[in-house]
Each structure stands twice: as C-alpha cells, then as structure tokens.
C-alpha cells in the first residue's frame, strides 16, 4: 500500500468574515479626562506582628516545678485554660497539661480552687436566672383532683393491707 506524502497546502480562498456583525453600544466607553489617581501614601503595615507571641518565653522550661509558668495557664476556678485562650501550639499545650496534672498529683497545685469556684457559680447563677419572683399558680380544681386521687390510692392500699392481715391471721 502506497501513501503519497503531499505537503500541506494553504487554501487560496481568503478568510471569510461571519455574517453576524458586531453591535457597538450606542454610548461609547467613557474615557475620563483625569487618569485614576493613586494614593500618595502607600499601604502601611501595622506595627504589631499578625501572629501574637505565646506566653512561654524561649528560656522557660515546661515543668511541674515551674509554678510561675503553670499558674499562667490555670483559670481562677483551677481549671486548665484552652489552647485558644492560651495561644499555645499543640505540643506546648500538651506539655503544659501534663505538667499541671503532675503538679496536682504531687500536691503542688489544688485540683480545684473551691473558694473562687463558689463565688463564680453564685455570680453565674444570678446572671443567668436573674431575680426570682414567685408566681401564684394555685389552681383549685387541679389540686382537688390530685388530692382525691391520692385519697383513693391511700384507701385502696389500706384495704389491701387489711386483707393481708386478715388472711395471715387465719
């Protein structure tokens, strides 16, 4: 089978434009007389770094004996503060929690600070509940039904007890 190798030929016909014409909008694009003004002062970077420094310095050792360091990561109630509040890395937080637990076991730290906790609970409860007002919810019809049902139950129980006593006497 013989395949002839013919060179690629360009068509001699000119490029035909599509029949659809481009519709220009009636209003031309507005050209402003004044060019866009760039602000003379470039964007200033804030003085403070974006990532805040952690509370642990480079020389601080995370150890159960380092009480000044450990106390920074414990709340007033004696609970270990979360990583979000502490701004620590995962590794640092893990070491801090281990040090705090070790200090508690070796009685360097109390497990909970009960004095501050009671005070905190009292404040939290008063904030949540607000002042307490007693409402008179006495509905005489319901209480009468309840009392009559209770009386029926008591009388039925008394009858059963009497029947047992009589059967045991025989």
Swiss-Prot record:
One GO CC annotation: chloroplast
Source organism: Zea mays (Maize)
UniProt protein name: Small ribosomal subunit protein bS18c
InterPro entries: Ribosomal_bS18 (IPR001648), Ribosomal_bS18_CS (IPR018275), Ribosomal_bS18_sf (IPR036870)
UniProt GO molecular function: small ribosomal subunit rRNA binding; structural constituent of ribosome
Ranges: Sequence repeats: 4-10, 11-17, 18-24, 25-31, 32-38, 39-45, 46-52
Chain intervals with Basic residues compositional bias: 7-55
Family statement drawn from the similarity comment of this UniProt entry: Belongs to the bacterial ribosomal protein bS18 family.
A GO BP annotation: translation
Region (Disordered): 1-59, 151-170
Record note on quaternary structure: Part of the 30S ribosomal subunit.
PROSITE patterns, alphabetized: RIBOSOMAL_S18
UniProt lineage: Eukaryota, Viridiplantae, Streptophyta, Embryophyta, Tracheophyta
Compartment list: Plastid, Chloroplast
Pfam families in the cross-refs: Ribosomal_S18 (PF01084)
Record key words, sorted: Chloroplast, Plastid, Repeat, Ribonucleoprotein, Ribosomal protein, RNA-binding, rRNA-binding
UniProt-annotated stretches for the region 7 X 7 AA tandem repeats: 4-52
């Amino acid at each position: 089978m013989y395949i002839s190798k013919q060179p690629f030929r360009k068509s001699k016909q000119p490029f035909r434009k599509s029949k659809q014409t481009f519709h220009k909008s009636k209003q031309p694009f507005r050209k402003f007389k004044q060019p866009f003004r760039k602000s003379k002062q470039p964007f200033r970077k804030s003085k403070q770094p974006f990532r805040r420094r952690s509370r642990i310095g480079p020389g601080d050792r995370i150890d159960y004996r380092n009480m000044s360091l450990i106390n920074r990561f414990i709340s007033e109630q004696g609970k270990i503060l979360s990583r979000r509040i502490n701004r620590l890395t995962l590794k640092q937080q893990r070491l801090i929690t281990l040090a705090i637990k070790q200090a508690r076991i070796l009685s360097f730290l109390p497990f909970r600070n009960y004095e501050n906790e009671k005070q905190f609970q009292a404040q939290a409860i008063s904030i949540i509940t607000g002042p307490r007002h007693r409402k008179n919810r006495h509905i005489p019809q319901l209480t009468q039904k309840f009392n009559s049902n209770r009386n029926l139950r008591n009388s039925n129980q008394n009858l059963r007890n009497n029947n047992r006593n009589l059967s045991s006497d025989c």
